[in-house]
Structure formats: structure tokens, C-alpha cells
């Protein structure tokens, strides 16, 4: 029997908007943003035990760190490379660094498959909980704007980080699988957005969760699709 899955809390962080320097300069910027945002959503959800499965999604990953590492290697040779930069160049570094910071012993996943990484990561966490593989999950979606990321994307990349706490206990927003969309009535078409851009997707979901303060105990519904997401009150 499939479990119902709810988003209990969400949080966001942007170094550019908040103008707060990171305390640990040994970590890459994506790892720093993940740690800051998970800290915030843990406080918002009043999570005492942070040892929960972690799902990190990013379209481009730590491209700035990888580019810096490879640039020195190609231009000056392997002996000139700073070995301390290598951990930051690994794709799953943000998930591992966040796990170490919060002493997470549960599985940690990194999804990086292009512009749909945001919706794919949230959907993967949903499926794990819905099928009773895990009881709750922390989903962290992050992007870094860098020179190499701009070249790949063809434009500037929206930078920031969002975290969502998912579990089976009833919360503000319930996640529904794709097939359920066709059964919904009076879907708010004005709220439909393309889910291709990670930060645009995260911003919409974060606002959807944060703005919902019902007095009658009702919840909202988040329906995941490949092309868009549908939002409605249920």
C-alpha cells in the first residue's frame, strides 16, 4: 500500500541576496549553500534527529571547482594542482559534505541530469517514501552561477538553494504522482509553470508551501509531471 507523502517545511538560501559570507572557505559554494539551507529547514520543521536520507539535485553541480582543478592541471601540469581542491570537484561532494556536517548515516543521493534535476530529485524522494522504502527525506536543490555553467546553459544560471522536508505525517502540501493529475478537478492553470529550470521550479514550490497557512486543517496538492507542475487546494 502506497503511503501519502507531504512537504512539511521548506527553506531557501542565497549568498548573493543575503550578502552573508560563508564561514568555511575550504568547502565549495554549493556545499556551503546546502549546509546552510538544510540547517534552516531543520529549524523550520523542528527536526531533532537530522539523520534522515538526503536527496541532492543540481543541474550543473560543482562546475566552478571542477573547472579550476582541470584548468591548473592542463595549463601547469599535475604537480601544480592543489590536492585539497579535488574533493570539491566530485559530483556528490555537496551531499557528502552536508551529510558529514549533520552526521547523517542514512543513504545520500545526488541527481544531476540537466535542467529537470529539481523535479526529478523531488519525485525520487517521493517515490522512496510512497513505497515504504524510507519514512522521511530531506531534499536539497542547489545551483551555482559560474562562467563554465553559463557557457553550457547559454545564459546566466539562477543561483540559490532550496530544501524541503518530506514525510508521511500530514503537512501543508501533499505530493501526488503524475497519473493523479488527470483525476483532479479545477486545476489552477494560472499556476502551471514549466518545471525545466531548477531554481524556477524550487521558487514556485517554496512559495506554494510557505504561503499556505490554512485555519481549517486543509492541505494543498503538488502534482508532478514531466512538463509542468500543477497546484491546487484539496
Locations of regions flagged by a protein language model:
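Short-chain dehydrogenase/reductase
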Residues: 122
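Conserved "HGTGT" condensation-loop signature of ketosynthase/thiolase-family condensing enzymes
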Residues: 1-107, 112, 116-119, 127-131, ...
